[in-house]
Amino acid sequence: MKKTIFQQLFLSVCALTVALPCSAQSPETSGKEFTLEQLMPGGKEFYNFYPEYVVGLQWMGDNYVFIEGDDLVFNKANGKSAQTTRFSAADLNALMPEGCKFQTTDAFPSFRTLDAGRGQVVLFTQRGLVGFDMLARKVTYLFDTNEETASLDFSPVGDRVAYVRNHNLYIARGGKLGEGMSRAIAVTIDGAETLVYGQAVHQREFGIEKGTFWSPKGSCLAFYRMDQSMVKPTPIVDYHPLEAESKPLYYPMAGTPSHHVTVGIYHLATGKTVYLQTGEPKEKFLTNLSWSPDENILYVAEVNRAQNECKVNAYDAETGRFVRTLFVETDKHYVEPLHPLTFLPGSNNQFIWQSRRDGWNHLYLYDTTGRLIRQVTKGEWEVTNFAGFDPKGTRLYFESTEASPLERHFYCIDIKGGKTKDLTPESGMHRTQLSPDGSAIIDIFQSPTVPRKVTVTNIGKGSYTLLEAKNPDTGYAMPEIRTGTIMAADGQTPLYYKLTMPLHFDPAKKYPVIVYVYGGPHAQLVTKTWRSSVGGWDIYMAQKGYAVFTVDSRGSANRGAAFEQVIHRRLGQTEMADQMCGVDFLKSQSWVDADRIGVHGWSYGGFMTTNLMLTHGDVFKVGVAGGPVIDWNRYEIMYGERYFDAPQENPEGYDAANLLKRAGDLKGRLMLIHGAIDPVVVWQHSLLFLDACVKARTYPDYYVYPSHEHNVMGPDRVHLYETITRYFTDHL
């Protein structure tokens, strides 16, 4: 196949690629071998080999709570030891009204603490929701629920819940058993398939995870209203009924009309709803809604359709009128606000804003006139989670990649700026929860050699270890896991990789290698977590004599804007160049059988897998592409146009990434897998690729999961990976 100029350039760079010194986890070659039922989520024995964890661990004021056996455990965080109060399912049953007993008393129900009341929890039972006051030890209210109830959102004080049923939005107040939902207020009444209230919008991009937003005191509820009538529906077919049923999916594809979103505010005291006067154009993205502490203003980060401009606007909550634009952010590639405003404790006019304006995600202090007071954090690293403030509101707490892109540590910094202080210096991945008053943290820690360690730290006063998980792999054979860096195709950017070696590795032998690929934004596959972030299937294939290699190419997450945005308007090109540098590294290893290299990936990784098989069929013998994007014209607007621009603006980029036009280039064995009811990468993608292959006289293999969406989850995931395993063992 004729090489493009771009391919010739990156191949010459990759020829000079050498791996920098790597580290390795020593293998344990003696012991039993794993099964897929033990290694894959959904497997019958998966949780026997999953590092032990603390169930339901979360803060309740300055106390932390979790489930242990059939007890809810309530501990005071004092930095030294656990002061434990226990409350069992049997104790709870004794307090429940007649007719609301749990069907079993051998386990405490799942729960969540509420933002305000320090002793308030909501219990999720088989009959509905139970409000429970831990301190007073009494049931405070009940909500009946059913399978039609969705998108539950509790008010800050926990006495009301917003929910969606049949596309309409309701607010219910807890009452006696059987009265909860029947006493609900209908906030909207005209909901339909094409007019949806209270749900996440814009395909859940821009950090949008829900569609309702309570004001701080619970007196108002902001909500999304999404008109989809201008979007042409895509059919999703359920084949289980005797006569198959088609349901419309309102999926706005790149370059086509988008849905129109507005924001309403319901005032509980008056029963009145006002809509924000967001004006024209209607095709824009209303993201990251946040309330002022006094409930008078609702702030919205508004992104234009081109996604190169973000305006942070203020609206009057009483009238819906536009008040002011606080500031505007622009970027020649794209903007992507992911976080709402976070106000300083006790302040109604100063807040923290997260932005990548200097090339890295950092924290900025603003006032509500739009004046930038200062940039608080700085450096060539990313803030990955802003946790909150200390009790005085003078210090900020956050997680970041400052120590390494492979790690997350918990830091504090004075709000006036200065040096950061690492409060979790142990090398690895720290996932933290800051207590509501900012005085303590729960630190859930993993490293390549630490399965899980849970520590409760009273900041500045001491720590208490709640859990040190044992190695769940003891007694089983484990392959060697190597990690290190290679150079990207630009010759100057280091890329992190992980390499799972074949079990019982003999350097004198030759082994096949499978490249597991994703490569796109918002994903990082190589981290310093348990087993060096190696997945169960990698270990399973190592048992069968395969090596599995993964490299986070440019375009992937947590390495800054320039690292990610290099793919803009040309998806699949830079990522593929970097993946081929990884292949060159593999070929430089004496033990690699260069004639037996395979590739596997899902979603964006499915696109990459198919692309690699079509472009480098002389290198990759076998590929398995799951849920693949085949033609970006048929992907949704929010993600697709962010990274590609609209098809009308970038026809060359869309054309270069359109794999339908290259079906005739298939040389090796390629199996495509798709969920028949996939709402993310619609089934149309792989079906049309099959049709293109028929016309081109090429012969991929194909597997469909009729009952699954974008990912095959639950027990069927074991079946999925047995299918993938058989394909590689048969053909590679």
From Swiss-Prot:
The keyword Transmembrane helix does not apply. It comes from Porphyromonas gingivalis (strain ATCC 33277 / DSM 20709 / CIP 103683 / JCM 12257 / NCTC 11834 / 2561). GO terms for biological process: proteolysis. Pfam families: DPPIV_N (PF00930), Peptidase_S9 (PF00326). Serine proteinase. Releases tripeptides from the free amino terminus of proteins. Has a requirement for Pro in the P1 position, but is inactivated by Pro in the P1' position. Transmembrane segments: none annotated. It catalyses: Hydrolysis of Xaa-Xaa-Pro-|-Yaa- releasing the N-terminal tripeptide of a peptide with Pro as the third residue (position P1) and where Yaa is not proline. This is Prolyl tripeptidyl peptidase. It comes from the Bacteria.
